[in-house]
């Protein structure tokens, strides 16, 4: 009797039919992947992407040249030169450079900044063709801040209860 059952299974190709049914279910199921360059997935508010220097709403840069980000950077990727003190006692940076080749995107600079001047924004598409383009100066960082300010402010506001 066992040989008849085995012959029936082989003749009716039960394993083949069940495997084919499984394949067809997966074929018509929704796709789990994205067509990346054309479709982009959601990014976490805590995502650490391209660096940016922020400005106050009046247009003045936030960085007060305290150099805490330079001191805490484990990769020593940040270089800051502070300008002379102003009449009101504040000072600003003359030079603010980040070597993105050295940067390990740890976020320590963002955590150390007392005025939220340096942040890691939501941009993850900043590949370049040359190394020189990965040396960010103050102008490039401020341009990034201007470009991504709305998203950066939203992400900081969402993360505020946990800071």
UniProtKB/Swiss-Prot annotation:
[4Fe-4S] cluster 2 binds at residues 73, 103, 106, 109. This is NADH-quinone oxidoreductase subunit I. Its cofactor is [4Fe-4S] cluster. Belongs to the complex I 23 kDa subunit family. NDH-1 is composed of 14 different subunits. Subunits NuoA, H, J, K, L, M, N constitute the membrane sector of the complex. It comes from Brucella abortus (strain 2308). Residues 53-83, 94-123 form the 4Fe-4S ferredoxin-type domain. Its main location: membrane. It catalyses: a quinone + NADH + 5 H(+)(in) = a quinol + NAD(+) + 4 H(+)(out). It comes from the Bacteria. One of its GO terms (molecular function) is quinone binding. GO terms for cellular component: plasma membrane. GO terms for biological process: aerobic respiration. PROSITE patterns: 4FE4S_FER_1 (PS00198), 4FE4S_FER_2 (PS51379). The keyword Transit peptide does not apply. It is found in: Cell inner membrane. InterPro entries: 4Fe4S_Fe-S-bd, 4Fe4S_Fe_S_CS, NADH_quinone_OxRdtase_chainI.
């Amino acid at each position: 009797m066992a040989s008849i059952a085995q012959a029936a299974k082989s003749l009716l190709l039960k394993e083949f039919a069940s495997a084919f049914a499984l394949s067809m279910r997966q074929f018509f199921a929704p796709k789990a992947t994205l067509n990346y360059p054309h479709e982009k997935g959601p990014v976490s508010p805590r995502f650490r992407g391209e660096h940016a220097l922020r400005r106050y709403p009046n247009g003045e840069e936030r960085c007060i040249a305290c150099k805490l980000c330079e001191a805490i950077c484990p990769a020593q990727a940040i270089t800051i030169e502070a300008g002379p003190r102003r009449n009101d006692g504040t000072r600003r940076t003359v030079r603010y450079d980040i070597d993105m080749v050295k940067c390990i995107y740890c976020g320590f600079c963002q955590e150390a900044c007392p005025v939220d001047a340096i942040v890691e924004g939501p941009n993850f598409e900043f590949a370049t063709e040359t190394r020189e383009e990965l040396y960010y100066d103050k102008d490039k960082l401020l341009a990034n801040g201007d470009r991504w300010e709305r998203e950066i402010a939203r992400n900081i506001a969402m993360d505020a209860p946990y800071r």
